[in-house]
Swiss-Prot record:
NCBIfam families: PRK11797.1 (NF008761). Homodecamer. Substrate binds at residues 28, 106, 128-130. Its EC number is 5.4.99.62. The active site is at residue 20. This is D-ribose pyranase. It holds the Pfam family RbsD_FucU. Pathway: Carbohydrate metabolism; D-ribose degradation; D-ribose 5-phosphate from beta-D-ribopyranose: step 1/2. Belongs to the RbsD / FucU family. RbsD subfamily. Keywords: Carbohydrate metabolism, Cytoplasm, Isomerase. GO terms for molecular function: D-ribose pyranase activity; intramolecular lyase activity; monosaccharide binding. GO terms for cellular component: cytosol.
Amino acid sequence: MKKTAVLNAQLSGVIASLGHTDGLTICDAGLPIPSEQQCVDLALTKGVPSFLSTLEVVLTELFVERILLAEEIKQANPTIEQQLLEMINKLAQTQGRQIEIEYVVHSEFKQRSNQAKAVVRTGECSPYANVILYSGVPF
C-alpha cells in the first residue's frame, strides 16, 4: 500500500503524468466537465470530499508553478478563497518559489479548465470553489 497522501489510484496516476505547465483542475460538484476530458470523480455526496481537503492532499504531491481562479470567488466565496490562498502561500514557502496567482472571469475559467489535462471533481457545493493548478518543475 502507498505511503504517500494520495491513495486514489486514478488521481495518483494523473498527478504522476503531469508535465511542466500541464493544468489540473480541482472543482466543485457543479463545474461542467466535457465528456472527452479525463475526470477523476471523487464526489460521494454533498460536501464529501470537500474542495479544500482535496486540494490539501493534491498539493502534497504536486509541484505548482501557478494557479488560476475565477474572479467571482472574491465576492461569492471569500472564506474558501482565503483558505486556498493560505495553502498556496504555505506551498510556495515549502517549494522555495513564488506561485503566480491569476484571476479571470468564470466564463474564461471554464474555457481554460477544458484545456487542463484532467479534472478532479469534489463533492463541494459552494460557489466558485474551483482552481486550476499548473505543474512546475522542482529543478
